[in-house]
Amino acid sequence: MKNINPTQTQAWQALEAHFAANKETRLKDLFAQDPKRFDKFSLTFGGDILVDYSKNLITEETLKLLVDLAKETDLRSAIDAMFNGDKINMTEGRSVLHVALRNRSDRPIECDGKDVMPEVNAVLAKMKGFCEKIISGEWKGYTGKAIQHVVNIGIGGSDLGPVMITEALRPYKNHLQMHFVSNVDGTHIAETLKKIDPETTLFLVASKTFTTQETMTNALTARDWFIKIAGDKAHVAKHFAALSTNGKAVAEFGIDTNNMFEFWDWVGGRYSSWSAIGMPIALSVGFENFEALLQGAFEMDMHFATASYEQNVPVLLALIGLWYNNFYGAESEAILPYDQYMHRFPAYFQQGNMESNGKYVDRNGKPVDYQTGPIIWGEPGTNGQHAFYQLIHQGTKLIPCDFLAPAISHNPIGDHHPKLLANFFAQTEALAFGKSKEQVEAEFLAAGKTLEQVKDLVPFKVFEGNRPTNSILFKSLTPKTLGALIAMYEHKIFVQGAIWNIFSFDQWGVELGKQLANKILPELNTDAAVTSHDCSTNGLINTWKAWKA
């Protein structure tokens, strides 16, 4: 990867001039000028995912200049470096090879001169055997009963991905009841333990190091609860498995290391659902469906690695997002899935994007003087329409939105799905084209009102429009399609980080709070007044001490 400040490139200067000349562009005019705009500004991936980016504030010239920026910042070398196993996570000295985890070809992928695929495939085979035993009921608990409940204990990448994917693939789930515990707040584990029977429960402890504070606190609580009822520590081996690389700590916990499923330093937490961290996904929907998830991601990987920038879905989405972030000054992007099964999809990519590209230091170690990662948020439609769409439509902030929806529902009840999709189609049309003063007045006249009667109300019913959106329509939410969609967003994030000249695969921003929490924790175990911090922190701690007494 080359360390190029994007703002110093000729393409960036050209984009600034282009923006200055075209910032008053109206989507209404762009569509009026070109009846074939949809054909020019949409792509189909794999025959079952349509990406319509025509409702964006872009022209063919805009895209040409954005592609020039990708070329001038040498995006190609960054893509090649990732797929070739180069140590592009330089602050931690690691390769970034989540693409290896879903490599469904015979192509070797090397890290430090060694092909990682034999180890990847060995872990997948081990996962498959384990899943088959649990799902079939062959695996028995300490009283001879089959497993009915699976509790995944993890946090961050060891939780958000498995939660999102198991929820999204709920139509494919088997009889196993899945539970997820992440928060160190005792309420999370306590409420989960109320729902399960130790005789029929399998706990998955997901921590690469087996030292993560939140995860190990919850795991120890679960183990203590289990032993108290089961009565023998030896039974832990039949009810706990580890997704980890720390064999010594796993064994000391009481887990049989034969039931430890490893992954590697070149797997980042927020990109780890394709690895052993995906065990709860495989247990929930079966290993064949987990493999279909990998296949979908692999096909998107191949598209990303080989397609021209002009026909490359992740690259185009990244460049369009950069256009709003760095030239229009948009601070956030909304991800709005019109599918209730995808209700955790925005939260998953909130982590994926903000932990990856929430950086203010470039790859040269210098503070940047341009905007990097956006704020990511969203909720499923149509719920969001009755919550925050008001601000998107008529507020003062520009919020580019991605709308996602399946053409075919897993639950075709009555006219529910046509009504859902009517809203999906209507929202991007409304955001793009709005409603003019003249249209509002015409509606009032048609309803029998006079303009004099409604003149004070008219301004409030005007929609400016010109709000940009992408529409991502897919045939059905299958494991394969979901895998492709996740990989699409992963690569979008990578492209933006590469162009912004930042490191997208570390997360030093999570460390300071943890360090301070470790310092504060012993102070909470005494009754003495705390004076070692600033007056605000001291005041908060001392008030807590007084109140808990």
From Swiss-Prot:
Domain of life: Bacteria
Uppermost EC category: isomerase
GO CC terms of this entry: cytosol
EC number: 5.3.1.9
SUPFAM superfamilies from the UniProt entry: SIS domain (SSF53697)
Gene Ontology biological process terms from the UniProt entry: gluconeogenesis; glucose 6-phosphate metabolic process; glycolytic process
Catalytic activity: alpha-D-glucose 6-phosphate = beta-D-fructose 6-phosphate
Subcellular location: Cytoplasm
Keywords in alphabetical order: Cytoplasm, Gluconeogenesis, Glycolysis, Isomerase
One GO molecular-function entry: monosaccharide binding
Active site, renumbered: E355, H386, K514
Pathway: Carbohydrate biosynthesis; gluconeogenesis; Carbohydrate degradation; glycolysis; D-glyceraldehyde 3-phosphate and glycerone phosphate from D-glucose: step 2/4
HAMAP family for the chain: G6P_isomerase
Function statement: Catalyzes the reversible isomerization of glucose-6-phosphate to fructose-6-phosphate.
Family listed: Belongs to the GPI family.
PANTHER family registered for this protein in UniProt: GLUCOSE-6-PHOSPHATE ISOMERASE
Stated name of the protein: Glucose-6-phosphate isomerase
